[in-house]
Amino acid sequence: MASADDYFSDFEDDELDKLYEKAINKSVKETITRRAVPVQKDLHDNVLPGQKTVYEEIQRDVSFGPTHHELDYDALSFYVYPTNYEVRDYQYTIVHKSLFQNTLCAIPTGMGKTFIASTVMLNYFRWTKKAKIIFTAPTRPLVAQQIKACLGITGIPSDQTAILLDKSRKNREEIWANKRVFFATPQVVENDLKRGVLDPKDIVCLVIDEAHRATGSYAYTNVVKFIDRFNSSYRLLALTATPASDLEGVQEVVNNLDISKIEIRTEESMDIVKYMKKRKKEKIEVPLLLEIEDIIEQLGIAVKPVLQQAIELGIYEECDPSQINAFKAMQQSQKIIANPTIPEGIKWRNFFILQLLNNVGQMLKRLKIYGIRTFFNYFQNKCTEFTTKYNLKKSTNKIAAEFYYHPILKNIKNQCENYLSDPKFVGHGKLQCVRDELMEFFQKRGSDSRVIIFTELRESALEIVKFIDSVANDQIRPHIFIGQARAKEGFDEVKYTRKHAPKGRKKVERLHRQEQEKFLEAERTKRAANDKLERSARRTGSSEEAQISGMNQKMQKEVIHNFKKGEYNVLVCTSIGEEGLDIGEVDLIICYDTTSSPIKNIQRMGRTGRKRDGKIVLLFSSNESYKFERAMEDYSTLQALISKQCIDYKKSDRIIPEDIIPECHETLITINDENEIINEMEDVDEVIRYATQCMMGKKVKPKKAITKKKRVQENKKPKKFFMPDNVETSIVSASTLINKFLVNESGGKQLVTSNENPSKKRKIFKALDNLENDSTEEASSSLETEDEEFSDDNNVFIAEGQNGCQKDLETAIIRTGESLTTLKPLHNFERPNMALFVNDCGLPTKIEKNVKDIRGNQHNLEKEKNCTVDKNNMVLSLDDWNFFRDRYIPEGVSFDVEPNFVQYTKGVKVPHCHKVSKIITLFNDESNDNKKRTIDMNYTKCLARGMLRDEKKFVKVNDKSQVDNNSVNHDSSQSFTLSNAELDDILGSDSDF
């Protein structure tokens, strides 16, 4: 017979693999090759720790079975290539490879990535009958652009498409079930996959735009991981202009998206050069102003002692004070904090030194790249913040105090204030270059041309707008274009000082403080309103307001609309304008600053030269030229490494059977009227609205007042959990997972099935569960005790007196009637417990049904004789009475009315009965060695022995059938009278006490 361990054995590894891979047609075969490698050994011929003696090579052979998608074999013989646009060689090649492999398409911006994706989607729409095609983009504007382009290229019927952007989940299940082509953000797809609304097995084609974002835990990565768990037979096409900044980043994207092939093109590629518009690049080196160099020198003098200390401690590399780098200082500080071996005191000292160097590095960067105005705002804020905290003793950083209280910083502050007080002062040479370039450009091209200026900092963007506006040229109309976040507020010295000032102990002081705070708050509100009113009067007022409060999507949309319309012809953008927005045709790009990221640089330059020639002006100061050239060289090297197959790719399913090789049919696609309408729309929200109405099968109508109607709530579909095939989805009880065994007569184990599970029937007395006993006797045995535990002898005898007459005792029975006189509960502490007394012959006195003579001191039972209760409310049922009659001795049982604890003992404890109270008092006296109690006990014992010796009857039973509780006298001294001689004889006898 199998042992118990066999029933609880774990799954084998191959069983687990089969369990997780039942739903996919992918099989992996691994071949491991091991080779011995030389290792270092000690004198005892033992391998040193950490040495590997074997080198392993793992080769994985991946194969795919037939796809689970329902294919249209009549359409598999060819694929359609639209000829509505110019046929380009690189697009033709990439489309052909993307149909049969998971491809990462990396080509310059404006080179038709959307056309490639649309063609792939069109053919998988033709080849499959029910499968889903999904196009994902990270933002709403990008999704709107893609649905506009795809429907205008492929001609896919609009009733088969859906756009999923809104947070509302209304009709989402129905949309996924009835449509085939979807345009959505990756977050929507991820959420619907997790909710069970979208079946991952239904997906046959997934297009990912801006694929360089597929790193870490971004939604793109999560979507692909989720689909891979259930489906390996789907095509993935990733689109980007720059896959990553380095080889490791490219490999991460390839791994996360299951890429099998990278199709990369540069502006110098042979098959793309002829289609590229001319982009003239102009690099301008801008020297630093003398005022800037003077401030840099003074900052170097102030920070030199701190820098020298950092160099001596080995936490920062040796350099000139003017070359302090904020990024390097931040990296070093993070390493120090993460190092657990450094003592806490040394760790925080080094951290504060590097933190100060980081702040100085930020000052130098702003001064060299953006100018004195941007520098002074940051410098003044940091100085004010530290000095205020240090004066209030909220900071004890002496290293930073040595710098911020340096006398030379006061000189820097005074110089900057003098410079900025002059309205004609130019804070940096780049501003003059921007003005000259714009003047020359608009004189040649006219005011109908468009210009974008890129900068990283918001303060710098606003400064550029104000400076351009000061030129007072009607041809140049600038506006800022930034993100939605509000500007960071500077350090408020007054607010911080008042917050940490003494609150005041007296009520008058607290009230005075509250009045001051209200007054200051009113002043701030009034000043903010006045400033806003002044800004609205200036031409740059909207830009200033946007810089303070940020630009929401509505404001961004309005600015872009005005830019396309010509109300503004110069946009000063932060990184928000680098990708993802359809800003339109731009003729001039000015990069006010540069970064070390080739992705950012390429995205910026890709905003021009799409449909006509453009110009790019790169402004360099300090070491920006070196950073730009190095970034572009690294990207060129990266492209070469990708072309040399230095990436570890993943094999993907062909989906189409191997014996079918589709031919290319170049076809002119006929676009229907609805798709043509979408293609002609310019407004993003209008495109989304129209596509949504087409998705819902509605005609576009002007908005009207809608009368609300009561909706009949439909039954929601239960959430669906996607699992591998042939998996038990129902709930399994724990008892079915355990095997039960019994030992049979031969001593072996016998498996017990669920039908053979033995169970003992036990008699339960429900009435006994409700009894409240107040006795010192031991509790009766458990109600679950079987009948056999009680004695079978129904005849009980009592020997009494010397004669020892024995007679059968009859159990006193109270017969239940249809109605009984209602009795109020008697308080046990007012009377002794009602036991059954025996007469001279030992026979019990029967207690009649009429119990009207039983009464308490506080309840008048005579007034309630006529009250009746149902017989079911008695203490015991008939079966319980019979059980007591057969099993119990009458002297040990007393029957009483069930007490109503809820009514009479609601707020107090139920006291003990008279008998129990006397026993408790007795034992307390014995524990306390009460002599009076001892004498009384001896006296009682002696009286009892004397009476037994004389054979006197000491129990007298009233012949009457009714017993009065008050007639019972428990004082033994009053029951008998003895002479003095008899008493002395008794007291002189031996005593057990």
Curated annotation (Swiss-Prot):
UniProt cross-references to InterPro entries, sorted A to Z: FANCM/Mph1-like_ID, FANCM_DEXDc, Helicase/UvrB_N, Helicase_ATP-bd, Helicase_C-like, P-loop_NTPase
Recorded hits in Gene3D superfamilies, A to Z, give: P-loop containing nucleotide triphosphate hydrolases
Keywords attached to this Swiss-Prot or TrEMBL record, sorted alphabetically, are: ATP-binding, DNA damage, DNA repair, DNA-binding, Helicase, Hydrolase, Nucleotide-binding, Nucleus
What's its top-level EC category?
Answer: hydrolase
Q: PROSITE patterns, alphabetically?
A: HELICASE_ATP_BIND_1, HELICASE_CTER
Transcription regulation among the record's keywords? Answer: no
Q: Which GO terms describe its cellular component?
A: nucleus
Known Pfam families for this protein? Helicase_C, ResIII
Q: Assembly state and interactors?
A: Interacts with the MHF histone-fold complex to form the FANCM-MHF complex.
Q: What does this protein do?
A: ATP-dependent DNA helicase involved in DNA damage repair by homologous recombination and in genome maintenance. Capable of unwinding D-loops. Plays a role in limiting crossover recombinants during mitotic DNA double-strand break (DSB) repair. Component of a FANCM-MHF complex which promotes gene conversion at blocked replication forks, probably by reversal of the stalled fork.
- Its protein name is ATP-dependent DNA helicase MPH1
Q: What organism does the record attribute this protein to?
A: Saccharomyces cerevisiae (strain YJM789)
**Taxonomy of the source species:** Eukaryota, Fungi, Dikarya, Ascomycota, Saccharomycotina
